[in-house]
């Protein structure tokens, strides 16, 4: 593509350098002829006029040949044979034998060059550069494709259209609209350098710099790249997209958006395969979910999305260094999996969930959602819940498993199941009316239930099956009883904003 552009430029420069080089006179034959009485240097020719000049043969009904200027003016049924493959048809012509420039007019001037055709009302053809020009609408065809523009050029030496102003390239499968286009007919590739839209039955491609292979339907975009495909959008700096396979690779500022499900997956590199119903993004990858007016940001080293046969979101998977931010809850883990069918988000390998002033950890955490928000949270194996109540004092609940129940997105109560342990501080109203720590309940039991008030604070703890409980004044609680085994306080790693999901 670049080589052909250089060739066009060199041919143009050669044309400038060689203007006026030819002094060979035009030769002609005709059925009848006479000198113009007012201009004896001009011959008026009639009937079967044939003129030749340096490899070109011209046919016309009549003509005027100016021997002083070495120019030829022809009329009606004009045929110009420029080479074995290149022919021009028209109704009126002026040819300068010194500059080798043809100007030809007709209701429709037709240039045929092998399988390429150019039509216009007026063409200027420079023989030195093998280039035809038009400046008032032209219509080209090459194979099964048509090219239309207000102005343009066609180079018959290298078989290239250069067209601009209201450009349209189309065939039975697509329509390309732009302002400036170079179309190399040998490889059927369109090269564009301005805002370009490519429409087809299945997709829309937008680019401001790139190439489009009209035969294979493969697009290469290097600036402001955008593809839309049935509710699926891709934006990036650089994009390679195969329309037939519905497969794309994107580089730089990548955004893959599922408009049907209101999900955007972003990163620095991504791939999407619509026929196989998956996409993935890596390098600063993150997903934005918009639901019920709130947004959830999920980051992982690599994020995968899949859809079902009805183009509905099926799964989201994030691997390594996963963090999640939502206004009312945050999380961290090694990997995460979201099943859209069941609305379940599962966090694996050392997961942490923060909800308001609570921190929950477990081997695996499942968050079940409905239209109102979180419905139930399962803390599977090694459940541990912590709430900070003072600078160095924490409410703690620990057990084999835990379940937190919600209603309308608000927490109701939580069950700590099997081997439940507790450190729970008692508060009372202080002299200034603010809560004051007065004691601590410490104990173990088979199961425990914690109830939450309207402010989401733990208001009551119920123990079952003959628990072993002790109450201490706050200042007398032994140091070794203030922390349950495996205590961790991870507030420093909690994401406080969407940007924090990238901090590990």
Predicted stretch roles:
Residues 18-504:
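N-terminal amphipathic/hydrophobic interface segments
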């Amino acid at each position: 593509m670049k080589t052909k552009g250089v060739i066009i430029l060199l041919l143009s420069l050669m044309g400038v350098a060689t203007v006026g080089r030819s002094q060979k006179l035009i030769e002609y034959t005709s059925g009848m002829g006479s000198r113009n009485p007012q201009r004896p240097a001009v011959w008026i020719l009639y009937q079967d006029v044939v003129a030749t000049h340096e490899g070109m043969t011209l046919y016309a009904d009549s003509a005027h040949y100016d021997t002083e200027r070495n120019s030829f003016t022809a009329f009606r049924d004009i045929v110009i044979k420029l080479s074995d493959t290149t022919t021009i048809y028209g109704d009126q012509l002026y040819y300068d034998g010194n500059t080798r420039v043809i100007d030809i007019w007709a209701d429709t001037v037709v240039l045929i060059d092998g399988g390429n055709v150019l039509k216009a009302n007026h063409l200027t053809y420079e023989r030195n550069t093998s280039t035809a020009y038009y400046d008032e609408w032209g219509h080209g065809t090459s194979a099964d494709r048509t090219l239309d523009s207000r102005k343009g050029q066609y180079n018959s030496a290298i078989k290239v259209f250069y067209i601009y102003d209201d450009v349209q390239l189309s065939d039975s499968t697509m329509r390309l609209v732009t302002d400036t286009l170079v179309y190399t007919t040998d490889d059927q590739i369109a090269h564009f350098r301005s805002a370009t839209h490519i429409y087809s039955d299945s997709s829309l491609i937008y680019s401001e710099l790139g190439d489009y292979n009209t035969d294979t339907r493969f697009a290469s975009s290097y600036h402001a790249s955008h593809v839309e495909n049935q509710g699926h959008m891709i934006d990036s700096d650089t994009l390679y997209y195969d329309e037939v396979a519905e497969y794309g690779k994107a580089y730089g500022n990548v955004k893959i958006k599922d408009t049907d499900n209101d999900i955007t997956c972003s990163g620095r590199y991504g791939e999407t395969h619509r026929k196989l119903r998956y996409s993935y993004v890596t390098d600063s990858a993150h997903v934005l979910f918009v639901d019920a007016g709130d947004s959830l940001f999920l980051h992982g080293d690599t994020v995968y999305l899949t859809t079902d046969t009805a183009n509905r979101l099926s799964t989201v998977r994030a691997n390594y260094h996963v963090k999640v931010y939502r206004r009312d809850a945050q999380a961290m883990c090694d990997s995460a999996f979201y099943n859209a069918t069941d609305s379940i988000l599962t966090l694996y390998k050392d997961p942490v969930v923060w909800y308001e002033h609570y921190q929950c950890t477990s081997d695996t955490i499942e968050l079940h959602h409905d239209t109102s928000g979180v419905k139930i949270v399962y803390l599977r194996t090694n459940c541990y819940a912590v709430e900070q109540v003072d600078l160095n004092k924490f409410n703690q609940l620990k057990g084999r498993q835990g379940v937190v129940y919600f209603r309308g997105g608000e927490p109701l109560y939580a069950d700590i199941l099997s081997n439940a342990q507790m450190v729970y501080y008692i508060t009372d109203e202080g002299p200034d009316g603010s809560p004051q720590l007065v004691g601590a309940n410490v104990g173990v039991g088979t199961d425990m239930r914690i109830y939450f008030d309207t402010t989401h604070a733990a208001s009551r703890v119920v123990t079952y099956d003959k628990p072993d409980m002790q109450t201490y004044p706050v200042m007398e609680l032994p140091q070794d009883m203030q922390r349950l085994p495996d205590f961790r306080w991870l507030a420093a790693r909690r994401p406080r904003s969407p940007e924090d999901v990238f901090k590990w």
